Amino acid sequence: MRISLGYPAWDAEEAMLRQRNVSTPLATCVDETNLRGMQRHIEKMHVNDSVIRYILKLVNASREPGAYPNPLSPRASRALLQGAKAWAFMFDRDYVTPDDVQAVFEAITAHRLNGTSQSSLDGASLSKRLFDSVDPLAA
């Protein structure tokens, strides 16, 4: 998965540089036990066959001869499923919808379709083209 957080504002980056050797301890937001529990919950999450078919249609559309420079691999399929499950979990659901797949689609596929982590712009447009070519209701 690739996401961009952007760059800090001038003042924030300047403050960061001025604090050279000052380390700020991070507060724990989740302990290991809770994290493992969340992971187990996500693994057990229900995924309807129509969502699986939707992911397969998206991935297979990328594999049409000449359609995309770097078709999506089975690893991308798994990443889409895991990403969609995690997205659903963040919204306190124990099931996955096509909307969850759509929410994580570009972040998971753009760099894969483009074949490089350097320029995600082309990858993002490739992701959008692929995403727009598959109807989630037809899955």
Predicted feature locations:
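C-terminal engagement/docking regions of AAA+ P-loop ATPases
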Residues: 64-139
